[in-house]
UniProtKB/Swiss-Prot annotation:
Stated role: Has antibacterial activity against a variety of bacteria including S.aureus, P.aeruginosa and M.tuberculosis. Acts by inducing bacterial membrane breakage. Induces production of reactive oxygen species (ROS) which are necessary for cell proliferation. May play a role in inducing oxidative DNA damage and replicative senescence. May play a role in the coordination of mitochondrial morphology and cell proliferation.
UniProt name for this protein: Reactive oxygen species modulator 1
Record region (Sufficient for antibacterial activity): 42-60
GO cellular component, one term: mitochondrion
Gene Ontology BP terms: cellular response to reactive oxygen species; defense response to bacterium; positive regulation of reactive oxygen species metabolic process; protein import into mitochondrial matrix; protein insertion into mitochondrial inner membrane; replicative senescence
Keyword list, A-Z: Antibiotic, Antimicrobial, Membrane, Mitochondrion, Mitochondrion inner membrane, Transmembrane, Transmembrane helix
InterPro entries, sorted: Romo1/Mgr2 (IPR018450)
Major subcellular location class: mitochondrion
Name of encoding gene: romo1
Location relative to the cell: Mitochondrion inner membrane
Pfam families: Romo1
Family: Belongs to the MGR2 family.
Membrane-crossing segments per the record: 23-43
Source organism per UniProt: Xenopus laevis (African clawed frog)
Amino acid sequence: MPVAVGPYGQSQPNCFDRVKMGFMMGFAVGMAAGALFGTFSCLRFGMRGRELMGGVGKTMMQSGGTFGTFMAIGMGIRC
């Protein structure tokens, strides 16, 4: 399949770059959502200090990885 050329002679990103970009965007959105939901959840359980930071960080990484994976799969389907 020939490489599509955009305006001004710029080439389009290949499929791997699109999947990588989808993962990074999804990871960023998931981290932000994880920060909000993780903070709320940990504060509801009465966590403070180091325990709070660990719980929020764990939630951020989990939600970022999950949402990033789904976004990468979605971008891979679109290739």
